[in-house]
């Protein structure tokens, strides 16, 4: 059952949060990728593109694990376990929003001609890790 994300976790994800995303390939082996993180309500989100391994893996097996370290307190980190869904809706605007946050660019500058952007939306089942001062996230 999905959990409600604490305010402190949402703040972490709204900062320049880099996530290490684990998906599982067709052989069940983990694939690890670093991405720019975001949050929408109680869903943890990131952006990717069609043709990459992440969306292919997630369409076949929606299990996902994401680790995010707090840039302001390196001992603090959150680990999200959940199920992901991949959608095109709003993905172009989303990557531009992230480009503004991470690159201070109005438009994502690395878009390739014909590239189809995707948002991965994670329904979080469990949050691990430690918040600031080694306290649980709350």
Describe the predicted segments one by one.
Residues 49, 70-71, 124-125:
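Short secondary-structure boundary segments
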Residues 3-7, 31, 49-53, 113:
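Residues at secondary-structure transition points
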């Amino acid at each position: 059952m999905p959990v409600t994300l604490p305010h402190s976790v949402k703040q972490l994800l709204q900062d320049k949060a880099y996530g290490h995303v684990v998906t599982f390939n067709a052989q069940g082996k983990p694939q690890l990728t670093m991405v720019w993180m975001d949050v929408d309500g109680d869903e943890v989100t990131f952006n990717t593109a069609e043709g990459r391994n992440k969306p292919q893996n997630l369409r076949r097996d929606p299990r996902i694990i994401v680790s995010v370290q707090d840039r302001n307190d390196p001992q603090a980190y959150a680990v999200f376990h959940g199920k992901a869904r991949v959608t095109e809706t709003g993905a172009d605007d989303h990557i531009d929003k992230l480009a503004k946050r991470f690159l201070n660019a109005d438009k994502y500058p690395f878009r390739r001609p014909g590239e189809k952007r995707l948002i991965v939306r994670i329904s979080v089942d469990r949050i691990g890790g430690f918040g600031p001062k080694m306290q649980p996230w709350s």
